[in-house]
Every structure is written in structure tokens, then in C-alpha cells.
């Protein structure tokens, strides 16, 4: 699209330390007055070589690193890191562990969407929700802290299960949170959704058609807001999501408002999933001890340290077979995947990360061309990126 300019174009550098930048992203924007002619994202300020680090760490040693990709939804990065070797070596996860994982993942999804909503609203001029979301998010972090010992960077998932069982009274506490949180989402909607100033800022801004969304390889709310009913929890049938009753949240418009509505709807569905999982959670082990037995071989005894209950223990280290496998989960921002190649060694031969933020960000220059300067923040905010996973 060729845009005729009235004056000499001006080049402005937004970021990498701009208050609305959501991390260290730099945008080189070419302006004609207030109109955006071109936009070039500059990435790599937070690149730490995560894929190379994985090649000389065992999966267990690598687990604390992965929580630094998308540091606002760390349960998902942990889930994908343990799912890959589980699928590669065909380790089954006990039912209870699978339910615990679902509960943790959905709580993490709500926390991530809350911390998207607050700054997104602040970017377009509404300060109030920014303070509200921290109140609810803090409660989720309290639940995480009592179950995993950490507010963020939980290091909770293990190959074949989870690190430690849910503490006494946690399920009741979590159900109380769900009962408290559902009316709060309705409160956000009353405050935001029909606000005329908010609608002026987001309706028709950053529109992505269904074909564009598919061709650009978008995923998550970016894809579902463009009329594509695609959710990996339904498509890939991982964990026990099929046993619970929930619906895919989607919209047809494809603009910033549609992406907002999808995420609000997802928070409601997540609460529904958590409530059902808490009520249906079975008893039994929270980890697969078969993985430990494989590690011990024939010398395994019933009263070894490996089988004693001692808070959070590391997973056993075992060799990854000479195979390759792609595993993905539906993270809050989209399809988070790992392509893992084993080499009969305890270290992965290659661990490729498919981060949703990186791929969703590619469409940004196309969306902002021809828009006003102020719309850049709306569009960038509606994409929802975390630079930790974009730069890896």
C-alpha cells in the first residue's frame, strides 16, 4: 500500500525503554505528521540463547530456565518442557497429576490475561482497571505460592507429573477464589466494554481478516478474534480437557475490540474449567514413579530416597531416545511449541522453541501502516507480547 505524503517523512524511534513497550522492543516508525507510513520492529534486546543453553542441560536442569521465556505464564513453558520428553519416551501421567496440571495452567492463563488487561487499558488511557487487576492477580499468586512455594517462576511441573501434591485446604481456597472472581470479570465488563471512549480507541483498529490470520501463522486470541475456532486444548486433546465442559471463545471482527472480548471470555471459561477440575479431581499418585524406576534399573528398592515424600524433588534424569517430536500447548498468547530431537543422550540434540509472541508480532508493521501514531500502542497492546519469549 503506497501512502502519499504531504511533508518530508519523519523517523521516530519508539523504545526500547518506552513505558508502553511491554519490554525491550524497539520500533523504528516513519511518520507523516500523525500518520504511520512504515514501522520496523527491532528485536533481540532480551536474547539469551535459550535454545543453545538447552543443548547442554538435562531436561530437569533446564526447567528453571524455561520460566524466563514468558515470565507471566510460567506454568505453560514448564508444561511444554516436560510434555516433550514425556511424549518422546512414552511416559504416562497419572490422572490426579493431569488434573492438577489443568488447574495450574488455567490459573496461569487468568493471571496472564489479567496482566494483559491492566496495561492494555492504561495504554489507551484508562487507569482504573490497572489497579483492579492486581488485586485479583495477587490472589492467584497466593494460591501458587501455597501450592508450589513460589509466586512466579514456579518450577512445579515434573516429567511424569508434578513436583508436590496440593496442600491441605488448597482446593477449598481455590474454589473460594473462583466464586469471588467470576463477578469481578462482570465488573470489568461493566466498566470497560460499553465505554464510548474505549470503543472509539479499539473498534476497527488493527483489523486482521480470517485469511490473513491463517496466512501469517497467528495463534491464540489473535487467531480466534478473526473468526477461526482453533484451540489446541480441543484440537490436540492433551491432559484431561476432553473430560470437562467448556467452549472455545471466538469473535468474527478481527479488530482490537474482538481480541479484548476473546480474552475476557477466556477468563470466564478458565474459571469454569478450574471449578469442574477441582470438583472432579481423583485421588492417587501425583507423579509417575515408573520414570524413577527406569532411572534406578534393577537396584531399585521400595524405601529408597527416590520414593520417600520430601517436598519438591527433581525428576529423574534419563536418556532421550534417538527420535524427534513436536509438542504444543495452548498458552495465553497462542501456540507455544517445542521441537525436540533426542540423541541417546541425557541432553537434547536440538530444542527449537516456537513462541507465539514472536510469530504474532510479525504482523505488526502491516497493521499499523496507514494508522495514527496513537494507534500503535492500541494494536501492540492487543497483540499481547512478552519480550522474554519473543527474543528467547
Swiss-Prot record:
GO terms for molecular function: NAD binding; oxidoreductase activity, acting on NAD(P)H, quinone or similar compound as acceptor; quinone binding. It is found in: Plastid, Chloroplast thylakoid membrane. Pfam families: Complex1_49kDa (PF00346). The keyword NAD applies. It comes from Marchantia polymorpha (Common liverwort). Transmembrane segments: none annotated. SUPFAM superfamilies: HydB/Nqo4-like. This is NAD(P)H-quinone oxidoreductase subunit H, chloroplastic. NDH is composed of at least 16 different subunits, 5 of which are encoded in the nucleus. Belongs to the complex I 49 kDa subunit family. It is a peripheral membrane protein. Keywords: Chloroplast, Membrane, NAD, NADP, Plastid, Plastoquinone, Quinone, Thylakoid, Translocase, Transport. Its EC number is 7.1.1.-. GO terms for biological process: photosynthesis, light reaction. The keyword Metal-binding does not apply. Disulfide bonds: none annotated. NDH shuttles electrons from NAD(P)H:plastoquinone, via FMN and iron-sulfur (Fe-S) centers, to quinones in the photosynthetic chain and possibly in a chloroplast respiratory chain. The immediate electron acceptor for the enzyme in this species is believed to be plastoquinone. Couples the redox reaction to proton translocation, and thus conserves the redox energy in a proton gradient. GO terms for cellular component: chloroplast thylakoid membrane. It catalyses: a plastoquinone + NADH + (n+1) H(+)(in) = a plastoquinol + NAD(+) + n H(+)(out); a plastoquinone + NADPH + (n+1) H(+)(in) = a plastoquinol + NADP(+) + n H(+)(out). InterPro entries: NADH_Q_OxRdtase_suD, NADH_UbQ_OxRdtase_49kDa_CS, NDH1_su_D/H, NiFe-Hase_large.
Amino acid at each position: 500500500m503506497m501512502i502519499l505524503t504531504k511533508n518530508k517523512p519523519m523517523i521516530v524511534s519508539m523504545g526500547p525503554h518506552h513505558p508502553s513497550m511491554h519490554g525491550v522492543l524497539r520500533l523504528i516508525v516513519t511518520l507523516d505528521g500523525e500518520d504511520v507510513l512504515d514501522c520496523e520492529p527491532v528485536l533481540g534486546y532480551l536474547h539469551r540463547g535459550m535454545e543453545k543453553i538447552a543443548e547442554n542441560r538435562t531436561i530437569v536442569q533446564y526447567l528453571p530456565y524455561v520460566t524466563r521465556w514468558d515470565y507471566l505464564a510460567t506454568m505453560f513453558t514448564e508444561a511444554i518442557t516436560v510434555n516433550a520428553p514425556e511424549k518422546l519416551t512414552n511416559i504416562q501421567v497419572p490422572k490426579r497429576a493431569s488434573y492438577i496440571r489443568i488447574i495450574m495452567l488455567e490459573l496461569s492463563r487468568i493471571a496472564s490475561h489479567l496482566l494483559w488487561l491492566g496495561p492494555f487499558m492504561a495504554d489507551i488511557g484508562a487507569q482504573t482497571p490497572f489497579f483492579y487487576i492486581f488485586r485479583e492477580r495477587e490472589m492467584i499468586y497466593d494460591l501458587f505460592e501455597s501450592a508450589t512455594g513460589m509466586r512466579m517462576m514456579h518450577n512445579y511441573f515434573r516429567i511424569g507429573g508434578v513436583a508436590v501434591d496440593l496442600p491441605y485446604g488448597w482446593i477449598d481456597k481455590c474454589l473460594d477464589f473462583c466464586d469471588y472472581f467470576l463477578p469481578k470479570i462482570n465488573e470489568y465488563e461493566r466498566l470497560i466494554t460499553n465505554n464510548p471512549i474505549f470503543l472509539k480507541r479499539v473498534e476497527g483498529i488493527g483489523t486482521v481478516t480470517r485469511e490473513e490470520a491463517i496466512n501469517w501463522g497467528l495463534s491464540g486470541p489473535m487467531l480466534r478474534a478473526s473468526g477461526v475456532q482453533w484451540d489446541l486444548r480441543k484440537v490436540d486433546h492433551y491432559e484431561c480437557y476432553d473430560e470437562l465442559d467448556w467452549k472455545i471463545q471466538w469473535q468474527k471482527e478481527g479488530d482490537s475490540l474482538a481480541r479484548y472480548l476473546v480474552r475476557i471470555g477466556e477468563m470466564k471459561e478458565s474459571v469454569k474449567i478450574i471449578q469442574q477440575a477441582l470438583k472432579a479431581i481423583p485421588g492417587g499418585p501425583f507423579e509417575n514413579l515408573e520414570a524413577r524406576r527406569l532411572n534406578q534399573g534393577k537396584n531399585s528398592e521400595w524405601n529408597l530416597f527416590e520414593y520417600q515424600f520430601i517436598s519438591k524433588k527433581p525428576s529423574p534424569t534419563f536418556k532421550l531416545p534417538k527420535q524427534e517430536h513436536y509438542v504444543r500447548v495452548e498458552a495465553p498468547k497462542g501456540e507455544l511449541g517445542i521441537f525436540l530431537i533426542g540423541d541417546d543422550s541425557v541432553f537434547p540434540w536440538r530444542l527449537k522453541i516456537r513462541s507465539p509472541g514472536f510469530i504474532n508480532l510479525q504482523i505488526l508493521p502491516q497493521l499499523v501502516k496507514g494508522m495514527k501514531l496513537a494507534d500503535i500502542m492500541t494494536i501492540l497492546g492487543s497483540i499481547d507480547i512478552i519480550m522474554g519469549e519473543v527474543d528467547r
